[in-house]
Each structure stands twice: as C-alpha cells, then as structure tokens.
Amino acid sequence: MHSTIVYACLLALAVFVALHGTPLAALAENGEGTTQPDYDNSTDYYNYEDFKCTCPAPHLNNTNGTVMKPIGCYYTCNVTRCTAPDTYPCYNLTEHQAKNLTTSPTTLCAVGNCDHGICVPNGTKELCFKAPNLEE
C-alpha cells in the first residue's frame, strides 16, 4: 500500500514537471538566474587595492589618550602603495622628523586628517612617539 502511494506521488510530480518545467527552467526562460559571474574580468566582488593592502599601517603613540595615528596618509605594503581613507587622523611629519622619533614622547607632532593621500594639518599638535615594535 505504501509503495503505491509513493508511486502515485512520484508520477504526479513527473507529470507536473513535464507540463510546467522546473522553477530553474522558468527563470532561464525569463533570462534570470543563468548568468555566471566573470571572475577573470570583474571587480564587483573584490576591491583589489584593499586585498593588496593587508599589512598593518605603522602608527605612532601619543600621550593624550587619543587614537594612534599613522605618519602621513600612505604606506607601502609589499610593493603596493596603500592610502588611508579620507578624514582619517594622521601625523604631518617630514621624513627627517619621522626617522628621528624615539620610543619616548619627546616630539611635538602636527595632527591632521587625510585628504586624497595627503595629511592636511588641522592646527593641533600633540606629543607622539614610536611604538616599541614600530620598524624603521
């Protein structure tokens, strides 16, 4: 008796599919659900610059409890030049000033905000210093 019920249900399903098609076939007739992403030529799925900029940007410490900030608004990650987002806080230091920083808070650093890769000073200064693990 049970096998008859299963057979009848399968037969009904087969007739339904034969008459109406599958839901995927209906989507294909409407032009939906059939396109595959072109992984070789598409940038819709990955921001390749973000993917290449996976190294942490070197940041400096400060004495007033605000967030640590990078020296300028760009850094190199492997061979990629990485840029901090606009309005990101930064220190506007010359290369000479940055090289002479120590792990003690002895340098008054100009604070700014990034704008298209440039640290634009905002008129404030704070003592900044290298984190002990900051590479040269």
Swiss-Prot record:
The keyword RNA-binding does not apply. One of its GO terms (biological process) is negative regulation of chemokine activity. Residues 1-28 form the signal peptide. This is Evasin P991. Glycans are attached at residues 41, 61, 64, 78, 92, 100, 122. Gene3D superfamilies: 2.30.130.100. It holds the Pfam family EVA_Class_A. The keyword Secreted applies. Disulfide bonds join 55-77, 73-114, 90-119, 109-128. The lineage of its organism: Eukaryota, Metazoa, Ecdysozoa, Arthropoda, Chelicerata. Keywords: Disulfide bond, Glycoprotein, Secreted, Signal. GO terms for molecular function: C-C chemokine binding. It is found in: Secreted. GO terms for cellular component: extracellular region. Salivary chemokine-binding protein which has chemokine-neutralizing activity and binds to host chemokines CCL2, CCL3, CCL3L1, CCL4, CCL4L1, CCL5, CCL6, CCL7, CCL8, CCL9, CCL11, CCL12, CCL13, CCL14, CCL16, CCL17, CCL18, CCL19, CCL22, CCL23, CCL24 and CCL27.
